[in-house]
A protein has these predicted regions:
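Short, structured segments at the rim of ligand-binding sites
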Residues: 1-142
Length: 142
């Protein structure tokens, strides 16, 4: 594992497609990786109509993402900040985790049962790589 400093340059447009094209399942996590890129990263979701549910939550962390229909444009920002966000699905949850690792301050992700469906003990794996992360049990409101 290595950590590279600096900002990535936005790639050419990313268009999801059936195999052997770019997998729709990787779209959210790649979007999170490009939140701080130089320039604009364009995503075109060609397989599912509701694959951008994580965008509003990423915006709470300072991401600049514009969605129009099946297209999302990520305008890279200098920094992300911690926020209280809600996981809406498995892949979006992974994207929130990735963005939280790059954000300044603390991020609290709720509804993590979505993440648990696909990533068993993700907090242990990320902590083993050096992340400052812990699981906190949610308490029910009276």
């Amino acid at each position: 594992v290595c950590r590279r400093t600096g900002r990535l340059t936005a790639p050419r447009p990313i268009r999801t497609a059936p195999y052997p094209g770019f997998p729709t399942d990787a779209q959210a996590i790649l979007m999170a990786a490009l939140l701080r890129c130089r320039g604009a990263a364009v995503f075109e979701e060609n397989l599912f109509s509701s694959r951008y549910r994580h965008v509003d939550e990423l915006a709470r962390m300072g991401a600049d993402i514009r969605v129009s229909g099946r297209t999302a444009v990520v305008l890279g920002v200098e920094r992300l900040h911690g926020a209280a966000v809600r996981c809406t699905d498995l892949r979006g949850g992974a994207a929130l985790c990735a963005a939280a690792l790059a954000a300044e301050g603390e991020t609290a992700i709720s509804d993590i049962t979505h993440i648990d469906r696909g990533y068993q003990s993700i907090e242990d794996d990320l902590a083993a790589l050096g992340a400052d992360i812990r699981r906190v049990e949610e308490t029910a409101s009276p």
